């Protein structure tokens, strides 16, 4: 079971005007704006991977062929915000909505994001369960932690200042040391 990103539902945690000011670029240097606008989501994705946290809200879909035996389904989506939809999908792809009440978010949506399943769920009987959740900071979720916003700024600034200086390391997207330290301090640990 892998959560599928269905839709980005919010804005980037750092906008283009904020990054232009952070990089001390004047408003007449519009040639760089397109590059910076493309670097923002890339830097966010790199910081998200390092911190194991979602910095932008999104909607995800999970499809199950069986209800979890212990009534618990860990998800790699932190922070988990809400269960949006629950349904049963038959062989023809028709979705029958069910009350999402028996499916809820676990007690720690940051460090142990999971779904809890109540005992009163209908049997699947050859159908699949479809569950949509929202996850990520911003929007309806909690605010992005300030150290991760700074890590995003530092990452983007490092990439912007050192563009074209890869020294043969094609595809290197390593975080600058200061940004990596900030992301590590906020990292969600796994056992």
Residue ranges with predicted function:
Residues 1-191:
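Divalent metal-cofactor coordination and adjacent catalytic microenvironments
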């Amino acid at each position: 079971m892998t959560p599928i990103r269905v839709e980005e539902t919010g804005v980037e945690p750092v906008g283009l005007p904020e990054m232009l000011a952070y990089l001390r670029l004047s408003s007449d240097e519009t040639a760089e704006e397109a590059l910076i606008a493309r670097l923002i989501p890339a830097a966010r994705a790199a910081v998200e991977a390092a911190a194991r946290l979602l910095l932008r809200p999104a909607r995800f879909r999970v499809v199950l062929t069986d209800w979890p035996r212990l009534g618990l389904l860990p998800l790699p989506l932190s922070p988990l915000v809400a269960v949006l939809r629950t349904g049963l999908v038959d062989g023809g792809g028709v979705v029958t909505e069910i009350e999402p009440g028996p499916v809820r978010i676990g007690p720690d949506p940051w460090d142990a994001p999971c779904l809890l399943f109540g005992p009163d769920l209908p049997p699947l009987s050859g159908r699949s369960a479809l569950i949509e959740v929202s996850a990520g900071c911003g929007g309806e979720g909690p605010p992005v932690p300030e150290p991760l916003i700074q890590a995003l700024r530092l990452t983007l600034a490092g990439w912007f200042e050192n563009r074209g200086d890869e020294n043969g390391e094609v595809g290197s997207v390593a975080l600058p040391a200061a940004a990596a330290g900030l992301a590590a301090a906020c990292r969600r640990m796994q056992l």
